[in-house]
């Protein structure tokens, strides 16, 4: 049996001590049997933690988890913050118990789930870092390479044809040897072009040459790398075509006749869901089949899966060793990528099958969207076209208690329109907006600079992996 390190125990105990009394009072005010049981469990949890009776925490953790997680799944969220607080304290009890039992995989599983659900990172990340390093040292792989993408399986003829009148400008970075380290006359000239023509004017561009030699370009192309080193880690996966599209379909169905809605139980048009999965299950069930698909630009919704906008770098910090920050970002001097929750956001990973779709929206941070593996189509509209884009407010995610927490960068303004196959009779103002859009296809090593406030629509044309480097100019 392992001892639980004081550096982990003390901050966890302080959180429980400071929260459990108020949480218990809030639970009792709900006046139902489950809430009453949670209150009893939390009092037992505090007593056992205070007495360091960690070997008795298993049943308490399981009881709290069952009561809170079932409510989340049934209701699509927690109606009261005390339920989230109960869940988090129960998870911390589970982490403590399984750590002392020396069960590395189970402890990391609970840590991952807690991380995704918004438990305090300062409590989780030190434990996750210790255990993930132990897991890596005990993991060896003799399995053959599993390519995320093979160009012979990519049907380039099905890619969108880029209108030359709407192409995003391409600039170079690190064209010659001097650029490799962000120094030398060639690089300074390249950076001057970027800063004067794009950064200062808030104009999108594609940057070529900088990321080509990042280790992840080849390393992450092998799905076996993720299977061998991180296969048991829990991640949030979006299944089916994008959530907002599904909500629109649901609203339309609710307006149909009684005869039509009577058949809704067999209607597969509402096909978006989110699920916590082991990374290996996501790869084996979705990524590998998609990599073998010779027309992944048209992957049907039931086969679409997306690890979208997730803080996988924080969760698996060893991934930091495989890439660099874009040179232009390092050189600006007046810009910074935020790396902590207090300061902002760290680089995020987007990993998915072909035909994942991100509806048109804008972010409040500038972004270097870097394509690592595969291909993506991106269409951009400037902020001055906002009145022509048929934006709607996504009211459904106002609750902070959804299965996967909301993005810090996504705005409420979003468009449900299919921008690649537009019904101009229904959306005539898009004829005006379409005089001003720009577009591109990103391939491995391409970096797209997207200024804050620019609307963007993104669709993967193959299995794909991208990195977002959001930053804010001082």
From Swiss-Prot:
Biased composition (Low complexity): 251-261
Residue ranges, annotated region (Disordered): 247-269
Family matches, as SUPFAM superfamilies: Clavaminate synthase-like (SSF51197)
Entry-linked InterPro entries: Cupin_8, JmjC_dom
Disulfide bridge map: none
Record-linked SMART domains: JmjC
Span of domain JmjC: 305-474
One Pfam family named in its UniProt record: Cupin_8
Source species, domain of life: Eukaryota
GO MF terms held by the record: 2-oxoglutarate-dependent dioxygenase activity
Alphabetized PANTHER family for the sequence: HYPOXIA-INDUCIBLE FACTOR 1 ALPHA INHIBITOR-RELATED, JMJC DOMAIN-CONTAINING PROTEIN F
UniProt protein name: JmjC domain-containing protein F
Gene for this chain: jcdF
């Amino acid at each position: 049996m392992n001892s639980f390190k004081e550096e982990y125990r003390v901050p966890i105990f302080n959180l429980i001590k400071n929260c459990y009394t108020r949480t218990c009072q809030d639970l009792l005010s709900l006046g139902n049997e489950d809430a009453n049981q949670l209150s009893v469990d939390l009092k037992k949890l505090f007593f056992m933690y205070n007495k360091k009776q960690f070997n008795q925490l298993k049943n308490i953790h399981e009881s709290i988890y069952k009561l809170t997680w079932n409510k989340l799944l049934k209701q699509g969220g927690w109606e009261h913050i005390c339920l989230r607080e109960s869940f988090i304290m129960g998870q911390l009890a589970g982490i403590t118990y399984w750590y002392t039992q020396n069960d590395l995989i189970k402890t990391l599983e609970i840590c991952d789930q807690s991380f995704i659900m918004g438990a305090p990172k300062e409590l989780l990340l030190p434990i996750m870092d210790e255990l993930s390093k132990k897991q890596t040292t005990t993991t060896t792989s003799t399995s053959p390479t599993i390519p995320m993408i093979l160009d012979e399986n990519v049907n380039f003829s099905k890619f969108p044809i880029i209108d030359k009148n709407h192409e995003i400008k391409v600039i170079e970075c690190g064209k010659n040897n001097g650029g490799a380290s962000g120094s030398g006359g060639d690089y300074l000239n390249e950076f001057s072009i970027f800063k004067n023509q794009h950064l200062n004017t808030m104009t999108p561009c594609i940057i070529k040459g900088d990321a080509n030699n990042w280790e992840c370009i080849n390393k992450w192309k092998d799905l076996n790398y993720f299977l061998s080193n991180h296969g048991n880690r829990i991640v949030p996966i979006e299944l089916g075509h994008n959530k907002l599209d599904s909500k629109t379909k649901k609203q339309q169905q609710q307006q149909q006749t009684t005869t039509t809605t009577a058949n809704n139980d067999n209607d597969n048009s509402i096909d978006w869901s989110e699920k916590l999965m082991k990374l290996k299950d996501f790869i084996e069930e979705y990524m590998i089949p998609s990599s073998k698909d010779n027309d992944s630009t048209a992957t049907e919704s039931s086969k679409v899966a997306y690890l979208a906008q997730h803080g996988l770098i924080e969760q698996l910090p060893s991934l930091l060793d495989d890439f660099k920050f874009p040179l232009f970002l390092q050189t600006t001097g007046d810009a910074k990528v935020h790396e902590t929750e207090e300061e902002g956001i760290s680089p995020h990973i987007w990993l998915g099958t072909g035909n994942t779709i991100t509806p048109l929206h804008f972010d409040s941070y500038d972004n270097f969207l870097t394509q690592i593996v595969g291909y993506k189509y991106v269409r951009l509209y400037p902020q001055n076209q906002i009145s022509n884009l048929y934006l709607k407010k996504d009211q459904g995610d106002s609750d902070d208690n959804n299965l996967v927490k909301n993005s810090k960068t996504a705005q409420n303004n979003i468009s449900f329109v299919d921008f690649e196959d537009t019904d101009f009779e229904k959306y005539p103002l898009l004829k005006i907006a379409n005089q001003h859009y720009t577009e591109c296809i990103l391939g491995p090593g391409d970096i797209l600079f997207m200024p804050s406030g620019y609307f963007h629509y993104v669709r993967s044309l193959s299995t794909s992996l991208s990195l977002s480097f959001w930053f804010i100019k001082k």
